[in-house]
Amino acid sequence: MFRRWVIYIIRLYQRWISPLKTMPSCRFYPTCSQYAIDAVGRYGVIKGGFMALKRILKCHPFHPGGYDPVK
């Protein structure tokens, strides 16, 4: 139940907040928000949330980015 709520919040971000950015800013594929949805859906809120946090912390100009799916 909590897992669905977290995914719903991330989808709200994708739908209403992310489009407000003028340029695409995620260096990864899939995007960090989609990665968070995949991780929470697969591993649950605690482990998936930790994986998503690590991914977001890697998303900066000095990291090359690229293809990084949930494993």
Swiss-Prot record:
Predominant location category: membrane
Cystine bridges: none
One Pfam family, short name: YidD
Keyword Membrane: yes
SMART domains in the record: Haemolytic
Cellular location(s): Cell membrane
Topology of the protein relative to the lipid bilayer: Peripheral membrane protein
Any single GO CC term annotated in Swiss-Prot or TrEMBL for this entry: plasma membrane
Nucleotidyltransferase listed as a keyword: no
Keywords: Cell membrane, Membrane
UniProt xrefs under InterPro entries: Membr_insert_effic_factor_YidD
Function: Could be involved in insertion of integral membrane proteins into the membrane.
Protein family per UniProt: Belongs to the UPF0161 family.
Protein name: Putative membrane protein insertion efficiency factor
Organism: Acetivibrio thermocellus (strain ATCC 27405 / DSM 1237 / JCM 9322 / NBRC 103400 / NCIMB 10682 / NRRL B-4536 / VPI 7372)
